[in-house]
Structures are given as C-alpha cells and as structure tokens.
Amino acid sequence: MSQTPSSPVPRGGGPSRLFILRPVATTLLMIAILLAGLVAYRALPVSALPQVDYPTIQVVTLYPGASPDVTASAITAPLERQFGQMSGLQQMSSQSSGGASVITLQFQLSLALDVAEQEVQAAINAATNLLPNDLPYPPIYSKVNPADPPILTLAVVSDALSLPQVEDLVETRISQKIAQVGGVGLVTLAGGQRPAVRVRLNGAAAAAYGLSSETIRSAIANANVNSPKGSLDGPTRAITLNANDQLRSAQEYQNLIVAYRSGAPVYLRDIASVEQGAENTQLAAWANNHPAIVINVQRQPGANVIATADAVLAQLPQLRESLPASVKISVLNDRTQTIRASVSDVRHELLLAVALVVMVIYLFLRNLPATLIPGVAVPLSLIGTFAAMYFLGFSINNLTLMALTIATGFVVDDAIVVIENIERHLENGDPPLRAALKGAGEIGFTIISLTFSLIAVLIPLLFMGDIIGRLFREFAVTLAVAILISAVVSLTLTPMMCARLLSQESLRRQNRFSLACERQFQRLIAGYGRALRLALRHPRITLGVAVATLMLTVLLYLIIPKGFFPQQDNSLIQGTVYAPQSISFSAMAERQRQLSEALLRDPDVASVSAFVGVDGVNPALNSGRLQIVLKPLADRRDRIDRIIPRLQALAARVGGISLYLQPVQDMTIDTLPGRARYPFTLQAMSLDELQTWVPRLQARLAQSPMLKDVNSDWQDQGLVAYVNVNRDSASRLGIAMQDVDNALYNAFGQRLISTIYTQSNQYRVVLEQERAHQDGLTALQRIYLTAADGSAIPLASIATVEQRHGVLAINHLDQFPSATLSFNVPDGYTLEQAIAEIDAARRAIGMPADMTLHFQGAALAFQSALDSTLWLILAAIVAMYIVLGILYESFIHPITILSTLPSAGVGALLALMISGQALDVIAIIGIILLIGIVKKNAIMMIDFALAAERTQGMAPHDAIYQACLLRFRPILMTTMAALLGALPLMFSQGVGAELRQPLGICMVGGLIVSQILTLFTTPVIYLAFDRLARNTHRPTRGVPAR
C-alpha cells in the first residue's frame, strides 16, 4: 500500500529522497539512460581487443641482385643513420638480405602515427643522395606492423591467363582500390609475377661479336626512352612532338639492332633470347596448392579490424565485375569471422550471467515484485554503460564485454542491499513509502562507500604502463562506469520502485516453496549464529586462521607458475618453413608445394596459402611462409594446440625442411614475424661475435626441458662464390672493377635495365644470363669483359673464384648487428621459468658482457607485467585504504575491511593451480577485482555495527554480532550473484574462451573461499582492534560511511 495523499510525507531518505517522492521524473531519467545506451550500442565499433598498437612503420627497399653485405652497407646503413635521429623512436630493427632491405621503426605509444610518418618521409628524403644511383625502386614505407597477420587474404587465379597477366590485372584493378580503403596499411602480393620483358644473354655468342654485356645493356636502355621532345609553335598552330622512342613488346626487342659487325647488323635475337615473362622469376605462391596471386591485406596500427575488412569485402563484387570472366577471386582468410564469433560468445555469456543473477535474486527473495526491481536495475546499468563507452571512444570487444559480464555481479549488489534493507522495515510494520525512505536513508552512504571503494581498486589499472596498461584501460573504465551507474540506479530507481511495488501483503503472500526456502534459510542463519558465537568465544583460533591465510597467500604467490597471456584458438596458424641454406629456388618451391599439399590432407584444415621467394617479408630463398586457416571451432575435431603437432607430423614426411607453427593471437606485440611465440635478441659489436655465441646459446637452450622449438634467424652457412680479381692484370688490360661488377650484375642479378611506360602501369626490361648458364660456378667461366683494345677477355683470366660460407641476412637492432632467437614454452612449464633458464644459460656458457640480450614482444611485455604485479596489487590495496579511511574517519576500520583480502587470494590462487592455469595478466586482473568484491562483506558488517554502537549504544560485541546476522542474507546474496556472474566466464568454451577462463576461475575460487572465511574472521578482527584501541586509551568508534 502506498501513502495516501493526505498522509504527511515521512522524513529521511538521504540522497534518495527526491527520487522516491518524484517517480515520474525518476522514470523518465532512467528511460533517457536506457535510450542513450541502446543508441550507443548500435554505433559502437566491434573488435577483438581495444585498439592499442605501437605506431609502427616499415620501410622496404628492393635492390635485385645485391648480396646481404651490399644491401646492408649501401642501403640499410644510410637509412638507419637518418632514422636514428628521429624523436620518439623507441626501437629500430632491420634485415638486409639478398636483394631486399627491410627496416621496422617502432615509435613510442604517445606519438601519433601521422607525425611518425612525416618524420620517416623526411629521413628518407635526407638519405636519397647516399643511396646507390642504380637503385631501381626508391625506399617505400608503409604504416603497418609486419608481425601483425593479415586481416584478409585473397587468392586470384585464372585458367585462361598466365600468372604475369593475372598479376597485371591485380595491380591495376584490385590492389590499388583495396589500398585506398580507410584503415588499410599495406596490400602485398605474394608470389608476385609482375609482367616484364626478359632478355637472356648468351655470353659466348656476344663475345663472338666482341660485345660485352654492358654494351648490350646500354644499347637496350638507349633504344627505349620516354622523355619530353618539346613542341612547335608557329604563327597559327602549335604542334606537339612525339616519336617511336619506346619498345613495348618482346618482339620489338628481338629486332633491336645492338651493333654492326663488318657492316652487318647484330640483332638482339642473335645474342639473346627475348620473351614476355615475369620481372622476378624467384617468387611463387599457392592457394590450396594451386599457383595463384595471393593478396594479403594488413591494417594500419590503431585501425579497427572489422570496419576495415568489411569495407574491403564490400568492394569485392565491384572488383569482380571489372575482371575477365576467367579470373576468380576467393577469400582464403577473413579474421573478422573469429572476432565476431568470439564477441558473440561473450555476449551470450553476458546474457547468461544476467539470467543467473536474476535467478539467484528470486531464490533469495522469493517475491516477483522484489525480483523485478534488480531485474530492471541490472540491464539498465549495463546498457547505460554503452553510452559512456561511445563518448570515450571505446569499442565492443572481448575485454569490455568481460568487464560488463563481471559487472553483472557487481551492479546487482547495490540493488540487493537496498531492497533487503527496505524489506526489513516493511516486515517491521512500516508502510511502503516510509520503509523506502528509512531503508534508503540508512543504506545510502553504505552504497556510496561500496561504490567508491570498488572504483578505487580499479584506479591502479589506469596507471599500468606500456601497451598492457593501454589494453586494460578500457576494461577498468568500462567496469568503473557500470559500477557508478549501478550506484545511481540503486539510489534513485530502486528505492522508488520499492515504494511502489513492495507491500506488507506482497511479502506475506508466499507459496509452499517460498515457505520451505525461508525455513531452510532461517536454519542457515541460526547455524551461522551458533558458529559465529563459537568463533567470537575463541578469537585466538580465528585470528590464527586469518594469519595462516595471509601466509598461505604469500606462499602460493611465490610458487604458482606465472605466464603472460593465454594462447587463443582463433582458427588461424602462421607457419615458417626453412630448408638447407644453400637450396636453390626451384628446389625450395617444390618442397613448399609438397608441404602445402600434405597439410591440406588434415581434416581440420580449411585452406592453406604458401609463399617462397625474397621480398619484404621473406628474408632468404631457403625460407617460406604459410598461412593455415582451420575450420570453424564447431566443425573441428580438435582445438588448435592439438592440431599443430599433427600438422608438424605431416610436415616431417616432406624431407629436407623444418616447419615452425604458431597460432595467430588477437594481440600482436612483436614487430617481426617469428618462428615461435617468444623472441629475444642478442646484440653484438660485430658479426663475428654473433657467429661465435648464437649457435652456442641456441644449442644450450635446445637441451633444456623448459623450452621447445628453440631457433634463431642466424644463418651463416649459405654458399658464397668470392670473385678475387687480380687488380694488376685487370689494370693492364684496361678493365676497371666497375666493369667486373657490371658484368656479374648483368649476368646474374636479374638487372632492371629499362622501363616500359603505359597509360596504366610501368613494366621493366630484365637482363640476365641464359638460365642454362646459371647452374653453378662454371657459369662464371662464360663471363667476358671488354679490354681497352676491344677484345673479349674471359673473367677467369684475371680472377679466381673461391667458394665460401656466408650469411644469408644481416640483422640490426638499433644499428648494431643482432640475431633473434625465439622459443615456445612446453606444457608443464611457464614463461617465467623459461626466461630464468635463458639467463642461466647465458651465464653458464660465459657469454661476454658486451653482448646484450633484449627480450622482445610478448616476452618483454611479460617481464614488465611481472615486475609491476606486486606494485599493482599493493597500489589497489593502498587506494582502497585511503578511500575507506576517508569515508569512516578512521585508521583502524579500513584495516579490518582489508583483512578479508588474503582469503580471496588463497581461493583464487588455489583455483588456478587446481585447474592447471598460470597466474597470467588476466588472472591478476581477476585478483584485483576480487579485492573490490570481498571487502563488501566487511563493509556491510562494520557499517551496521558502527551505526548500532552510535545510535543504540550497543557494546561492540553485541553490535558486530547483530550486524553479522542482519547482513548475512544480503552478504550471501551479493556473493552468490557475483559468483554466478563469473561462472559463464569460467566455463566458457567458444572462440577466444582461453582469454576469459582465467578471470572466471579467479573470481569463483576467490569468492567461495572468502565467503566461508570472512563471515567469521571479520567480526573477530573488528573486536580485536576495538580491544587494542581501548587498551591504548584511544577512541575507536569511527563513523559509518556517511
């Protein structure tokens, strides 16, 4: 029954009074929050994780035919010197291989990517004069992290057209359109077969005519030009000049006259074969074991994956229409599918958590009107949070949805506390309005203290450093906003609805089930009362249990295995293939094709794309890349951790290769794609030091059971033909070293000697020795040089050739020579143990002090997170102590409240150990949240005890005993609500479940143990501090949190 209009309005109500007395205004305010949240929800972007990336730029310079030494000294070093002067540069790594220089620049998180781009462009401009004059392509930079897997992989094939023709269509009609899409950072063509005219020189035939390869190169270059010719400007007309100065086809080049001998023309066809082919014949790609042009689309750092991929996919129908009917485009991999599936799973878990929480409320209250009130408050608080997320620039992702799922148990707590207190006054005979005002007035500041002390726990998360801190900022802020909105709803809508929906009649109206539940609950309260009296009579035992819990928490923290992030199953695997270092391209291509064919036999594999050849990603001819797309999780027999060993067993049947596989993760911290999950870099002053110590360290680590798949990118057994020119002999013949270099480059470097210009694209003319004359060292015997008198001189007459071993790639870290090793952690061991083992191995082999070891990517982030873990937890405790001390005006009572924390720590750590989980970053977040949850029990007890002492003059013993019994029901309800809110995360099985399970396990384990212990330890500690204060003659009574 509500108050009649003529009845005087009761006093009280605290901050809720206005909202209780103005139900229409309160209802409209809540509707506004609801609508704002719904509108924001539809506008929020979707992603796997918060968009947090280091500003990263990759600079690629191609120099076909150059050795790693030449690439490093002529291209990489000049560029590095300029890049090293840029402000905000955090790390610079480079890889100089045969024909390609790749420099990766990682900037500080605080630097905007556009600013970094301007600095890079300026540095490239400054280095231009220092680069080789015959460099066929200028340095090209891309706003992309090379370690970030493609968001889309497309395959383009044709039964009617050759691959060079398909490549030309892709370059002119597809790749440029995709690159124009907002958020796309880089579009690469794997297996690129750009059309070109290939001139394959017959050295012996040219020498017979007395022609050197340099003479032929000059003749071709001079015969194909595209330069301005001016115009004629007469009295009445203007005429533009043009000429047939370009040769556009292989046929035209065959008929090119390169010289005259005895008055007769020497055609190019007489001394070379000329054909229409590919610019680089040492590149190949396959899509599901069929030759193809594979398009990899990578996003810019910070770009939304789903928005970018959707924009690209939306263009595919139009792009297909622009291609001939024989050219087919297929999507091999779409990363958004697993991201959408993962987010969808978390949404379902969120809805399940809400349903479980409402069910718990009904079981405790056994009253539909009373259940309806928190049933409205929970979704309203969660939906309202979306509005704040939109204005803060957040996205709907795994972490923000996890925060909302956990918040389900938090936000209902406030409503439960308010409803339970108002019901108590109704049972005591107060009419609904009076009960609402009195109950809300009594509990209002308790709600405020609960809210601010819980938000205080989240404050340290906002100050976590580096990329991990940025990652969890959205999680912490989303959870804090949900808690804050919940407090507002509980102080406004909840008491207003109680005044209108609850009545003494509704409380008395109970069925048999309700009566049976109530009897059982009364027995439970009575049993708790007896156990509590026993604990209060034997305080030393209870205090001993509390101290033992604290000690056990410390012990468990020290011994529990520690990790970084759980390994996710995103249905995508990246593979790196390595063969013997001296393998030829054709042999490597055949093994890669065989491997692709073998992997496709696995029933859980949906598609395989494979690539070999040297480009901006692949460092050497003996390496290749794989991208393996698995079937959706629901359609597979096994999860990814079981599939990988199976695929490696299939690869073992293909002889002469090593295959390294690692699952693609949502969070990419590395800057270079590696063979294993955890990389570290050895940096030295010279390549000789690396040659000595890298194999030793790798061999030592390979023997350790704490690491597996130990490997390095150090390759120094490639075959090198060292041409030792007798300079004296060459000088007598009038042959310069430049002539020798040009002859070798013209023969074996796939030298780009001229450019064919068209309206839509540019094509190159490639000069090389005939393929049959490139089969070994004997090919050098067919090289001729032109002496000063015009005679043809064999290279062998002035030079000797020595076969040596050399490096296939030269790597730098911050301009110093380096080698990167990487490893995986076997089951039963942790990343913490593996890192300790690496440090021990380094000391054991006696590595010099001037060689430095730098952990990279995930290993580096783990070390940073591990170092800050204890400080993070301590900061959360200190923040909570300060807030509670201010609210209670006491130095003692916050300590009583914080004494509940060790029990939560024991429960969380034990749960992790029992389930076989490591204490990783996600689990640490769970422990920090537990700090905020479990202290609610103590706050509700102490707040009521202090109020009883102050207003009723009760003794501390009687006050805390009464407070424990009065608050037992809401304590049990709130704990069960939080526990069931975390339960869906604990038992999560969908895509990306590995990321969510540790959080749920921590929450459930910590809540169960803390619920059992704190009901007894908190009142005992409260009385112990009271006695201590009385014995020291200090005032003990703080004030309730008002």
UniProtKB/Swiss-Prot annotation:
Membrane topology according to the record: Multi-pass membrane protein
Extract the GO molecular function terms from the UniProt entry.
xenobiotic transmembrane transporter activity
Query: What GO CC terms are in its UniProt record?
Result: plasma membrane
Name the predominant localization: membrane
Quote the InterPro entries the UniProt record gives: AcrB_DN_DC_subdom, Acrflvin-R, Multidrug-R_MdtB
Q: Which NCBIfam families match?
A: PRK10503.1 (NF007798), RND_permease_2 (NF033617)
HAMAP family in the cross-refs: MdtB
Question: What name has this protein been given in UniProt?
Answer: Multidrug resistance protein MdtB
